[in-house]
Regions:
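Acidic/Gly/His-enriched mid-domain segments of enzyme catalytic cores or analogous surface patches
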Residues: 16-50
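Conserved alpha/beta-domain cores
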Residues: 42-361
């Protein structure tokens, strides 16, 4: 969000937008337009040939996945050159309705999603409601601070019937599409007990791959213990930034604090990856940070094994990975974590990057 942007452009005869860097030029001159067109040509050249599996220049495999929210999203994403979905936001089945979806209704949607991706991985996040996504039928009362209240898994613990139905529906979908690679994860897990509670119920429902989202400093710091209870973890960088920096991610004025380049946030990601290494469990990222080609290199250097993002960002991230070997990514990660500020972190990484990468940003 940019303060005053609406007033600044209302009388402008022309506005130029560079979506690659998030830059708006009000009343651009001929030179501005020519520069944008040249930048667009260089970006197209940098993306040329970006296809196939995600991997660094020296062959370290990194799965590149899509974030989706509906069966229609799945059908569109599945036609693209990516390796599955690292985040299916199941809450869209529950929002804006007076009663919970039935097991049959959910199973039908999950089946369509799995069928769309065939044998490719699909990671479903169980109901992530509460806070900015309230459920009218949950009957949990008003909360003074919903972001720190009963959201994510906490809501599922308060309304276990909702989770039971969802896990049953997911198991049904998995049975309907036996070749599918279904992974299921719980949001907003903060403790080992919560991870164990969810894993026991998911496995009892017949689900084979069970994980958690790391969105709180508590889960990141104790990731090695949390991961002893589950099969994988996925880092939600949006909420992890919010809770690490104590900054509401819905307030645009705090965007600088919520930057994925904040060294404190990167330290949390490093701790989570160390937990993954200690337990032999894979760590992924499904927040917006994974779709930034430059940040993606740092995440890989920290030990992240998969990146899930908006489908349209996959090609740029894949191209960025292929420009760098893993040792360079690791060096970038060390520089970023050790930086004093978010700006210093980004500048240090950019200085190590292949010059062609700038055309992808």
């Amino acid at each position: 969000q940019v303060k005053g942007i609406a007033d600044a452009v209302v009388d402008a005869p022309q506005v130029a937008l560079d979506g690659g860097v998030g830059e708006v030029i009000v009343a651009p001159n001929t030179s501005d337009v020519e520069e944008l067109e040249e930048r667009s040509r260089r970006r197209a050249a940098a993306l040329a040939g970006s296809s196939g599996e995600g991997a660094t220049r020296d062959g370290t495999k990194i799965k590149l996945l899509a974030n989706i929210g509906t069966a229609e999203d799945a059908e569109k994403a599945a036609t693209q050159d990516l390796e599955g979905s690292g985040l299916f936001r199941s809450e869209f089945l529950f929002l804006d309705r007076e009663s919970a979806p039935t097991v049959e209704e959910q199973a039908e949607t999950y089946t369509k999603v799995l069928q769309a991706f065939g044998t490719r991985r699909v990671v479903v996040r169980t109901l992530d409601a509460g806070a900015d996504k309230p459920l009218s039928f949950a009957d949990l009362g008003e909360e003074e601070n919903p972001a720190l209240g009963r959201r994510g898994l906490r809501l599922s613990q308060a309304r276990e019937d909702l989770l039971t139905d969802q896990l049953t529906a997911l198991a049904t979908a998995a049975a309907n599409v036996p070749d599918a690679e279904l992974w299921v994860m719980a949001p907003m897990v903060a403790t080992v007990d919560e991870a164990k509670w969810f894993a026991e119920r998911a496995r009892a429902a017949g689900l084979a791959k069970v994980g958690v989202m790391v969105e709180t400093p508590a889960a990141a710091i104790r990731a090695w213990q949390v991961l002893e209870e589950v099969d994988f973890a996925s880092i939600g960088t949006n909420d992890l930034s919010q809770y690490t920096m104590a900054a509401d991610r819905m307030q645009g004025e705090l965007a600088d604090l919520l930057s994925p380049w904040q060294p404190a946030v990167l330290s949390m990601i490093r701790e989570t990856c160390r937990g993954g290494e200690a337990t032999g469990k894979p760590i992924g990222v499904c927040g917006e940070a994974g779709g930034d080609p430059l940040v993606a290199l740092v995440l890989v250097g920290l030990g992240v094994k998969s990146l899930s993002m908006a489908p349209g960002k996959v090609n740029a991230v894949r191209a960025a990975l292929r420009l760098h070997d893993f040792d360079t990514c690791r060096q970038m990660a060390n520089f970023a974590v050790d930086a004093r500020t978010a700006r210093d972190a980004r500048e240090a990484v950019l200085a190590l990057a292949d010059p062609v990468l700038k055309d992808l940003l």
